[in-house]
Regions:
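Surface-exposed interaction patches
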Residues: 120-127, 140, 145-231
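Bacterial N-terminal signal peptides
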Residues: 7-15
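Bacterial N-terminal signal peptides that target proteins for export
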Residues: 1-6
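Short low-complexity stretches enriched in small and charged residues
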Residues: 41, 109-111, 174-176
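N-terminal targeting leaders of membrane proteins
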Residues: 17-102, 188-232
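Mid-length scaffold segments of soluble, non-membrane domains
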Residues: 81-159
């Protein structure tokens, strides 16, 4: 269960962070010929439909209510806090790819936000011009030549591939929340962090899920292309 929640966070952060930076029409035009190893496309399409329904009838209504009763400054503080917890993973990922400049900037971000940002509640690093450099164990393996394997859509967790799925257990143990006892508290904290981040992206997700022709190929190619870009 622990692994599922942290992987849920990482996978969806990857997809929605990329989608936020891209115009949907531009993406479709640029990556329409992108090739993905997808031998289980029938299953993947069905699981994508399941995940969309789960979002529409489960996550979205709950998060709409959460947004209505929770002040934005609280949500933003929580967002910054959980993002700061991922900084050590980004630091390690960049070091293992020999991206020392990026790793150094991640270290500075973590130090600035932890010390001057009240434990990460405030993102002072961005105001100082320090940028994030996404990296994780999956991008490390990709950087050193490990292929992605076949594409797979996981129940609830969403798009992934064989390589990234196999890194999820190790990824979990690089997270501070992995060492919180009891286990239910660790799961609850991770789930809240994911849900809070998602609460900022409901309009974007609605746009992608309900206004994108050929949704499954779009999500599949977005995920695989973004992962490849991060490994360079």
């Amino acid at each position: 269960m622990r692994i599922k929640f942290i992987s849920f966070i990482l996978i969806f952060f990857t997809i929605f962070a990329f989608a936020k930076e891209q115009n949907l029409d531009d993406f479709e035009q640029e990556y329409q010929n992108y090739q993905v190893n997808d031998p289980f496309s029938g299953y993947n399409k069905a699981m994508t439909s399941f995940n969309v329904a789960l979002y529409d009838y489960g996550l979205r209504p709950v998060l709409k209510g959460y947004n209505a009763i929770t002040p934005e400054f609280i949500r933003l503080g929580a967002r910054n806090f959980f993002d700061n917890l991922l900084a050590p993973l980004r630091f390690v990922g960049n070091v293992l790819q020999f991206k020392f400049e990026e790793a150094g900037e991640e270290f500075k971000r973590f130090a600035a936000n932890t010390i001057m940002g009240f434990g990460g509640l405030m993102d002072v690093a961005s105001k100082m011009g320090l940028k994030k450099h996404p990296a994780d164990l999956g991008t490390v393996l990709a950087h050193w030549g490990v292929g992605s394997g076949f594409h797979i859509v996981l129940p609830i967790l969403g798009p992934s591939n064989l390589r990234d799925t196999l890194t999820l257990p190790a990824t979990w143990y690089t997270s501070f929340t992995a060492y919180i006892d009891p286990t239910w508290a660790s799961i609850a904290i991770s789930a809240y962090g994911f849900g809070n981040e998602l609460s900022f992206r409901l309009d974007e997700i609605d746009e992608i899920y309900h206004n994108t022709p050929n949704l499954y190929p779009f999500l599949r190619d977005a995920y695989e292309q973004r992962r490849n870009e991060l490994s360079k």
